Design a protein with these regions (language model features):
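Active-site-adjacent structural elements that line small-molecule/cofactor binding pockets in enzymes
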Residues: 1-275
Length: 275
């Protein structure tokens, strides 16, 4: 399986420069996660791998509706031939609100994984975006493991129980480095409230115990505090470690601060100490 390290960094695909990738590698982050449904050709992945020496690159996630499995598999093999073991293929079903052809996502995921099998993409080199129990079980059975997004440590604990002890559990969590909670929540709102209209995320948040009132835009203080780690650097790291304590192997930081690199520099030594 691709070595991810304990902590990684999430940005939309195209969001990392080569210089930033090299600095994040030097700072000790283990993986660069490319979000926003990158196309099947996986542009930018090779550039980041070429610019660095050891850090891994992963997708979070390739959308099964828009990226044909055959083309994705070809991209995977091309990358793995040049940079063996350093790329993890994360895939997922996206959102019904965003996809005109949306069918039952579970069936489409199974078909997609079948195609990746036929194309020779190893189980241990792919992972699946998963929130609910059924897709979490599929992730454990058919891939290296699960990539939950917009979740709490309580979800992480339940996901680990479903996946068992051996499957990968790499969890995204948002970060704002600000000791003023009102200001931190305001910074977080644009990157949280979008998901409150998406029923798969809203349903998962309800499963985690949030009420309808919490999910009214822009989201309650209780919801924002649970989904976004904010405060001092020490407090933020402690909040991220709650996912590790709950069973995560890897925590993916999505930094919402205007100067995200400054935040990542500040957090890096504390994250290293926690490992």
């Amino acid at each position: 399986m691709t070595e991810l390290g304990r902590f990684g960094v999430w940005r939309a695909h195209g969001g990392f420069t080569s210089e930033e990738a090299r600095e994040l590698e030097r700072l000790g982050y283990g993986t660069l996660w490319l979000g926003g449904s990158p196309p099947a050709e996986l542009p930018g992945v090779a550039e980041l791998l070429a610019a660095t020496e050891t850090i891994s690159v992963a997708t979070s996630i390739v959308n099964v509706w828009s990226a044909p499995a055959k083309e994705v598999a070809e991209s995977f093999h091309r990358l793995d031939a040049r940079y063996p073991g350093r790329f993890l293929l994360g895939i997922g079903a996206g959102h019904p609100e965003m996809t005109g052809e949306y069918r039952k996502p579970y069936e489409v995921l199974v078909e997609y994984l079948d195609e990746l099998d036929r194309a020779g993409v190893p189980k241990e080199r792919r992972a699946l975006a998963a929130l609910g129990p059924r897709v979490l079980r599929l992730a454990g059975d058919r891939t290296a493991g699960a990539l939950p997004y917009l979740v709490t440590p309580d979800h992480t604990r339940g996901a680990r129980e479903i996946l068992g002890p051996d499957a990968l559990l790499a969890v995204e969590h948002k970060v704002v480095l600000d000791t003023d909670p009102v200001r931190a929540r305001a910074q977080a709102i644009p990157r949280v409230e979008f998901y409150l209209d998406l029923r798969n995320y809203a349903s998962n948040l309800r499963r985690l115990g949030f009420q309808d009132a919490d999910l009214v835009k822009p989201g309650s203080a209780r919801l924002l505090d649970a989904l976004v780690a904010h405060g001092s650097a020490k407090s933020v790291v402690e909040q991220l470690i709650h996912h590790i304590d709950a069973g995560a192997d890897h925590v993916v930081l999505q930094v919402l601060d205007d100067d995200s690199m400054a935040t990542l520099r500040t957090l890096a030594p504390l994250l290293h100490e926690s490992s």
